[in-house]
Amino acid sequence: MKLLNNCIVAAVALLLCAAPSGDACTSIMVGKKASTDGSVMTAHCCDSYYRTFVTIEPRKTLSPGETEPYFFNVLHKEEPWDTRGVHETGRIVPPALQTYRFVNTAYPCMNEKQLAIGETTFDGNRDLLNRNGVFWIEELERLALQYCDNARDAIRLMGEMAEKYGYADWGECLTVADPNEVWQFEINGPGPGEPGAIWAAQRIPDDHVGISANISRIGAIDFNDPDHFMYCKDLKKKAKALGFYRKGRDKLDSTDGRKWKVYSKQHLQYLSYQRFQTIQTA
């Protein structure tokens, strides 16, 4: 028994060493026909060194012409009033003058309309990183929860605003759910030059369960299926410029990990373990 316990401790230690803190989050998506009571779900474990307090942000009424600030590093605050390391990245013209009430955590997670969001980082290709953008991923979530009441509108708004004002973070996945459906939204920076964003989203079928554990999960994007896929403006053009797309195809295949991130064998083993453990406990 002592030997077995030592082996378990050693295995856990190896797994902890194998993944950096930013690569230890797992998100789960459940369609309404895959749950026992018809509920749509998104669940998210945030395994890193982020803020632990929760606040309920009230509704706000903005004045015509008023702009809204967005920030860097709010997820590391120790208290609601803590501003150390936090700075404004830019201001946007809000899409509406009235906001919804929402639950604010390290990664804002749900609003009063039952729009819910989970998060997991997949890093992405370094060549796509562009720090000149306004939005970091947690602030993009805040934007959606403030102004949207369903998953599709949330994805459209996050995508359009990221393209317009710029996305500054690493490759990220957001699992976006409402009472009817759940989607997986993946976003990268546009590369060097002008701020922008490259993104796509795929709907999880109603009778399916999806798992995203720190690796890009959207494989082929079907441009002829708008009920299951959404994507950024000029995606084909951008993908072609990056060498990710071949002319004449109706699908963009992003399953080649070299396009988005070079994963080490050790890292891939850890990510596979995350997904395996999730399936085992389902």
Predicted stretch roles:
Residues 1-9:
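Bacterial N-terminal signal peptides that target proteins for export
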Residues 9-18:
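Bacterial N-terminal signal peptides
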Residues 20-24:
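Sec/Tat signal peptide C-region and signal peptidase I cleavage site
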Residues 25-137, 157-282:
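A contiguous strand-loop segment
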Residues 141-147:
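Short, well-ordered beta-strand elements within core beta-sheets of diverse protein domains
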